[in-house]
């Protein structure tokens, strides 16, 4: 009996010892004793949360947790007491988007055979292997940059210097994010102590991460990137269904493949895991919101720094924003003329940048701050001070460092505020508080362990101040003058503190005041009357009424109400325009445009990219829209490029300058897609490295079309069988979905084409599949096969007078448009150029010059005919009752060489007025001159240097994604117009 009791006692003792944990273990001889686990920080100002502060308060920590916080708390007898009467204590700061490069997974050198079956996804014959971009070895997704199964927690091994730098800024924890790819993998939330990784990881899989950026192989465009994300989530949904079906009946069906990438997306699909999207630009931020809602995701967004451009769109995103504080700084330029090449947009970005965080909070959005994108983290507090000076309130800033990131990272029950039971992470600041520029972070506490960030000066450091002055070891002259006293000691020269204080005050005052205006201030409709009467004009209706002299047009509620010779009954709010001596015409339509496309016109990696969508990357911010309005253009067909036989889906827009991407889109338009023939698609001039992708010959192109149409038909058959029999649905394939719409007649083909023989072969392939081609684009040899084109029912959207600019257009002639028109082909003229799109009316006039097309018919080449080709003539293209009131007012005939577009209206709203355009240019020129003056003054006060100066000045010269492809003339408008105002 006694033996049994003894065993029970021993067992109890062992259990008790084990329950004490590592902190109570007796260390072996020679180890430094562990510090006490109980601490009392006494006499500090303590922020329990961003809006509640206690003075002369005490915070008690025990065994890594907060035990108590409040006034008049006695320090426990077993506590080490830390006097903190000159300190402010905050909940430990949290970086919600922490980049540490050492977490990148290794690159794989394994390869796989890219040839797959007929209905393959991206594995077309001869395309560049994804393996060169693969970072996750082993099983995974077909696109190498999709690695949701990558886990930061697996490879977390931060450099000690990185942790130290973050602690010096007051950060105690952070969410470490993966750094590469599109769907990048899961982040890990960690404490920023020096303890082993196993001890500091608080959440192993915090978020899933997506970056909207292009890659070395497919996808190489932003629209391709979005297509990859869309397809990956569709595949994940199918994968979940397929795996569940197999688990239910493993002996009755074929085993599905295991895919760790798709498996890792399951928690995202059921909203158990939040997705953090890094879009890279303001419009991609807008697209991130649309994409996340389309996919049904819980999401947050990493700010690009350009949200100031469209706060209205950011408000509609309606998600938390993680905001980096990487701000551009004004440089000192070596020559005064160098400022001529600095655009207004670059100056605006510099002046707005510090206000970005405050602006997002003003939209009612949650904001967390991060050190992400800073090449030198030391500038974080300086940039935070600038953000505070520009409207970010201190409680909001404190929330952005504590409660908001804690909530966003799912750790608010353990971090973010100072209250009993939470992890003992604290940030201790000397002086009046963290947001004072001169205050120092004294120490941080992580898991109840103190880390000194301002160590006391060592005796050796003191002695160094009294050593003899010596030249720098490099032999260069010291930048700081040495003054030697009688004792032979080096003495630091005195600085005139009053001068320094004056300069600092002047700089602060300059930086607080924003000079830059919002881009939207000079955009949008100039007039929005309920009704408009244009009277006594020569009206080119482009409809059955033809050309009317001294006629009237009445517009009501954005629609054409009456056209002709009538006595109008006007309401009191009708705007009357006397157009005596002027010409009124429908708004011009460009049937082939690449004007407003973000992140690449081509997804040229694969021979078929029917899954990519121009609608995902419409650029509403480009100044090209304003310039084209000045030429009378009101509608454009935005097309994918011609790098592959089957390109991406088109998007038809109205030039409602000032609206966002969704506001530009003409939603009544039928869906369309770009196809292409000729040299481009067979990679004739792509260089010796691009000679393997099928097709490589002209005869291979029709074969490829037959292959993809057949694949689409098989895909449709598979879905039809599923609807009859049930079971697991087929995998959604967005390429074949789009091609199936062509077979169904609900998506129109717009095909880049030059040679007559290729055009004929293409039409025959389409006819075998009962597909009618909507337009043959460029169609320079269309005059050779005009009868066949007319019989098929295709339109011809031509270049006017382009010929002999490459071998396959050697037989092009400027009479092609008129010749095809005479043979019954519906002909339009297009630009294929943002510059040419500003003068489509002169392109129409070439139809008169080359081929003697009657003037009213020639004008239809850029109005009614392209509307018919695009399937939108029910709404636009002519001035007829019931159609949209899209019209232009001209000084002379719209086909005259000396005509000037005076006004452009869309849906009864005036978007361009020549008189306003001159005022606008003057206003923008003055704004630019004022910004240059401010930048020069700031640069002179800062010396153009300091911590992080090189990176910040590089950022100053970067151009926004939305502005990368502006015409040179746009830069003239922004940089050189009215230079005397400088």
Predicted feature locations:
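Bacterial N-terminal signal peptides
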Residues: 7-18, 22
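Polyanionic/metal-chelating signatures
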Residues: 156-299, 303-308, 440, 446, ...
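Divalent metal-coordination and catalytic microenvironments
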Residues: 44, 64, 86, 97, ...
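His/Asp/Glu-enriched, well-ordered alpha-helical/loop segment
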Residues: 132, 274, 320-430, 518, ...
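C-terminal cap of metal-dependent C-N hydrolases
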Residues: 44, 407, 419-462, 537, ...
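Histidine-rich, glycine-flanked metal-binding segment
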Residues: 25-37, 46, 50-92, 102, ...
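Short, solvent-exposed loop/turn and secondary-structure capping segments
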Residues: 71, 93, 103-108, 186-189, ...
């Amino acid at each position: 009996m006694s033996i049994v009791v003894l065993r029970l006692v021993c067992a109890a003792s062992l259990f008790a010892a084990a329950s004490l944990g590592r902190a109570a273990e007796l260390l072996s001889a020679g180890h430094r004793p562990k510090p006490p686990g109980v601490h009392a920080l006494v006499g500090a100002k303590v922020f329990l949360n961003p809006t509640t502060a206690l003075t002369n308060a005490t915070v008690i920590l025990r065994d890594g947790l907060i035990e108590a916080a409040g006034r008049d708390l006695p320090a426990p007898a077993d506590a080490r007491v830390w006097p903190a009467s000159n300190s402010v204590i905050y909940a430990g700061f949290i970086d919600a988007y922490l980049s540490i490069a050492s977490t990148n997974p290794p690159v794989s050198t394994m390869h796989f055979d890219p040839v797959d079956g007929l209905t393959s996804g991206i594995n077309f014959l001869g395309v560049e292997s994804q393996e060169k971009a693969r970072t996750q070895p082993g099983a995974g997704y077909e696109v190498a940059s999709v690695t949701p199964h990558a886990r930061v927690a697996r490879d977390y091994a931060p450099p000690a210097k990185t942790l130290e730098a973050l602690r010096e800024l007051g950060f105690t924890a952070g969410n470490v994010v993966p750094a590469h790819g599109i769907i990048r993998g899961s982040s890990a939330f960690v404490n920023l102590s020096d303890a082993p990784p196993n001890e500091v990881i608080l959440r192993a899989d915090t978020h899933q991460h997506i970056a909207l950026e292009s890659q070395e192989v497919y996808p190489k465009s932003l629209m391709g990137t979005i297509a990859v994300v869309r397809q990956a989530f569709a595949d994940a949904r199918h994968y979940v269904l397929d795996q569940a079906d197999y688990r239910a009946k493993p002996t009755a069906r074929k085993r599905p493949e295991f895919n760790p990438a798709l498996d890792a997306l399951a928690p995202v699909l059921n909203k158990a895991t939040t997705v953090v999207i890094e879009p890279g630009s303001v419009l991609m931020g807008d697209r991130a919101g649309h994409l996340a809602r389309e996919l049904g995701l819980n999401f947050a967004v990493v700010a690009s720094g350009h949200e100031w451009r469209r706060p209205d769109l950011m408000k509609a995103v309606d998600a938390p924003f993680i905001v980096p504080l990487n701000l551009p700084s004004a440089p000192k330029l070596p020559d005064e003329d160098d400022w001529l090449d600095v655009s207004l947009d670059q100056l605006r970005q510099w002046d707005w940048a510090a206000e970005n965080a405050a602006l997002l909070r003003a939209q009612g959005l949650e904001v967390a701050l991060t050190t992400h994108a800073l090449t030198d983290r030391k500038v974080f507090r300086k940039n935070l001070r600038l953000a505070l000076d520009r409207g970010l309130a201190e409680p909001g800033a404190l929330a952005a460092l504590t409660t908001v990131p804690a909530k966003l990272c799912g750790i608010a029950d353990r971090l973010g505020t100072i209250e009993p039971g939470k992890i003992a992470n604290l940030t201790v600041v000397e002086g009046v508080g963290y947001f004072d520029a001169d205050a120092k972070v004294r120490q941080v506490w992580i898991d109840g362990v103190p880390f000194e960030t301002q160590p006391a000066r060592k005796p050796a450091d003191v002695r160094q101040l009294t050593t003899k002055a010596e030249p720098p070891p490099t032999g260069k002259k010291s930048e700081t003058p040495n003054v030697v006293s009688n004792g032979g000691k080096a003495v630091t020269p005195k600085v005139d503190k009053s001068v320094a204080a004056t300069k600092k005050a002047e700089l602060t005052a300059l930086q607080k005041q924003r000079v830059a205006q919002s881009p939207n201030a000079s955009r949008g409709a100039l007039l929005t009357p309920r009704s408009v009467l244009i009277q006594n004009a020569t009206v080119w209706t482009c409809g059955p009424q033809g050309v009317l002299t001294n006629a009237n047009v009445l517009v009501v509620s954005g629609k054409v109400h009456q056209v002709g010779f009538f006595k109008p009954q006007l309401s009191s709010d009708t705007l009357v325009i006397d157009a005596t001596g002027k010409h009124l015409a429908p708004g011009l339509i460009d049937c082939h445009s690449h004007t407003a496309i973000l992140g690449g016109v081509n997804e040229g990696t694969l021979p078929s990219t029917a899954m990519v969508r121009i609608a995902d990357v419409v650029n509403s911010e480009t100044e090209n829209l304003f310039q084209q309005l000045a030429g009378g253009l009101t509608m454009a067909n935005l097309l994918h490029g011609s790098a592959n036989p089957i390109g991406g889906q088109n998007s038809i827009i109205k030039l409602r300058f000032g609206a966002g991407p969704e506001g530009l889109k003409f939603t009544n338009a039928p869906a369309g897609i770009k196809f292409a023939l000729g040299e481009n698609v067979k990679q004739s001039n792509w260089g010796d490295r691009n000679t393997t992708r099928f097709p490589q010959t002209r005869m291979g192109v029709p074969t490829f079309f037959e292959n993809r149409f057949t694949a689409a038909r098989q895909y449709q058959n598979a879905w039809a069988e599923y609807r009859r029999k049930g079971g697991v649905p087929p995998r959604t394939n967005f390429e074949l979905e789009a091609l199936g719409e062509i077979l169904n007649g609900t998506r129109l083909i717009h095909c880049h084409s030059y040679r007559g023989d290729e055009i004929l072969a293409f039409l025959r392939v389409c006819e075998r599949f009962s597909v009618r081609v909507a337009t043959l684009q460029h169609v320079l040899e269309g005059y050779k096969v005009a009868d066949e084109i007319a019989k098929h029912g295709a339109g011809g959207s031509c270049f006017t007078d382009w010929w002999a600019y490459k071998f396959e257009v050697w037989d092009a002639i400027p009479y092609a448009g008129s010749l095809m028109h005479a043979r019954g082909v519906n002909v339009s003229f297009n630009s294929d150029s943002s510059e040419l799109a500003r003068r489509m009316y002169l392109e129409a006039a070439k139809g008169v010059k080359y081929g003697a097309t009657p003037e009213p018919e020639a004008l239809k080449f850029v109005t009614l005919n392209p509307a018919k080709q695009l399937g939108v003539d029910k709404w636009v293209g002519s001035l007829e009752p019931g159609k949209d009131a899209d019209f232009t007012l001209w000084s002379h005939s719209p086909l005259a060489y000396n005509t000037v577009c005076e006004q452009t209206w869309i849906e009864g709203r005036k978007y361009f007025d020549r008189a306003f355009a001159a005022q606008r240019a003057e206003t923008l020129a003055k704004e630019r001159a004022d910004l240059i003056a401010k930048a020069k003054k700031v640069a002179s006060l800062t010396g153009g240097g300091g911590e992080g100066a090189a990176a910040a000045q590089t950022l100053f010269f970067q151009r926004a994604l939305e502005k990368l492809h502006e015409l040179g003339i746009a830069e003239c408008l922004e940089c050189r117009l009215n230079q005397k105002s400088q």
